[in-house]
Amino acid sequence: MRKFKDVNELVNVLKPDYPVYCIRPNSIKKSTNYFKNNFPGKVLYAVKTNPNERVIKQIISSGIQDFDVASLNEIKLIKKIKEDSNLYFMHTVKSKESISSAYFNYGVKNFALDNKDELRKILEATNQAKD
């Protein structure tokens, strides 16, 4: 991958008419470390904010193991990159099929909910799992 001094150089050289990712690994590492060192709770990366594989790999290499996921596609992406990651299915309205697949196929044990109906759905989709 080619590196550029700054965004202006990139635009002048490539003259892109397509989206271009500008990934700054050191900035990702610095931000990740800041959160880990200053936030008193568990730090989760919300995959929906930037599901780019290179960004996620850099976040993982900086020590993040826990991910806020909102779809099966996000679950699949993270498990492909880091199989032993901890996933939190944070979408508050999920289909039974998505819950079941997340639980049985990908080992997701943490689900967000905001009402009794969603709790019932999670229990049904996981066969009344106790974990």
Where are the model-predicted features located?
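A charged N-terminal "starter" segment
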Residues: 1-110, 116-131
